[in-house]
């Protein structure tokens, strides 16, 4: 398994110059040696990136809730939230030894930027400032996971709010639980949105099943819903759980994955976990687009933030991501972010207003992937 960051595509758009600089980056890394604060002593920078961005995340132990003999969703949400709060208190946000730090983890991206800048200066080349279509300074993806059929009705409320700012979004449906009538999908696509596959059953077990049974279930779903095959180009796993086996299979059906956070605190793995970068990266041909803003559920129900603090946390992270020329990925859930829950609703409305004026390219995952790979391929 090998990764390739989109950062190089943004700052060195000529493929020949990029290849030369990438080789120089490797030589500089050899001279510098191990970077303090990074949890890897890889021999090459490419190995370091792959180790931190993928290997550490997929090596996380299987959470207890996914080992239960029954579906963890039978446990009432307040009880689940209380358990996460307890775990959260055992792993304080400010723990300096944590990797990745939360809500921002700059160390890998800082090292990458430093190496590329030094390599360019030594070669007498000027790196480009990361920009996106129309000179935008970064990109934003608005995504929504639909975790039950009851949540389908909440999509319209969110889209009314997003259309107020002329913003597209992407919506993930669970094949066994929240797969909608075709009319819902057609309406979203006509509205400029994208749909993606959100797990298969969202029971926490998919990544830990044997690969033949995973492959068979995906094949059965697409055989039964052939019309969705060209529309479903991406995937996000339930609870953001991932294993090397599942990640290696996804490219058989999908062109991008949204499962890995750059940093998440209080999630299914107990403490901090994530891929530690705000730049999308290829994993053996599959584009991984990290989830880079904290999810609504955790801010509201685990961190217990009020609306103002939710919004300030989102705004601060949005600015940090865009300042790097990265991709800010937002994930909200209609079950939590809806007009009946004013804390989350007001925070999301404020975030959308900020996004609309942030000088960012607000797009969908497939459009982002197409544009980024166009840069990569020259």
Question: Where are the model-predicted features located?
Answer:
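Acidic, His- and aromatic-enriched active-site or binding-groove loops in soluble protein domains
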Residues: 192-202, 254-271
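Short coil-to-beta-strand
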Residues: 188-196, 284-291
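Short, surface-exposed connector motifs at secondary-structure boundaries
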Residues: 164-169, 225-233
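An active-site-proximal "capping" alpha-helix that borders the catalytic cofactor pocket
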Residues: 216-225
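Terminal accessory/targeting
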Residues: 1-183, 244, 251-253, 263, ...
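Structural recognition of alpha->loop->beta junctions
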Residues: 191-195, 228-231, 355, 359
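Glycine-rich phosphate-binding "P-loop"
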Residues: 142-147, 197-217
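Active-site-proximal binding-pocket segments
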Residues: 230-233, 239-250, 255-263
